[in-house]
């Protein structure tokens, strides 16, 4: 997760990768359409933008902005970006304003970059891969997982199980599917 760099610094672990952070936010607003379909658009910055039905509410977003820290919060600029984009793309009876925001969600995406000394700022931020990287130290039996997406967690888990086995930890049944199957 986003704290592996801090963990590695505290334990003295040297790795080939590190993180840069992309902050994403979503706003929860009253239901904006009677339909229960996810709406997708391209935002002004060219990335995908969503309106996701949530019972009597709609989750709208997201942003993709650089963050220096895994600790983040919604800024006025973030909020306005989301409101402006949804208002431009839907012909609502009344445009959404800050007063319509019921709740806000904010987090960072840990993006993996090489630890070669470059800070990742010279790369096209929106084109950076959301893939993961794994650094292992067999001498200390240390595994660091960088980047990745929740939707790929099963594959990452299988990969990590392989590294754990390589380090001499006997897995109870390597053929057993561990992700919710009986």
What is each of the regions a protein language model found here?
Residues 3-59, 65-182:
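C-terminal catalytic lobe of FAD-dependent flavoproteins
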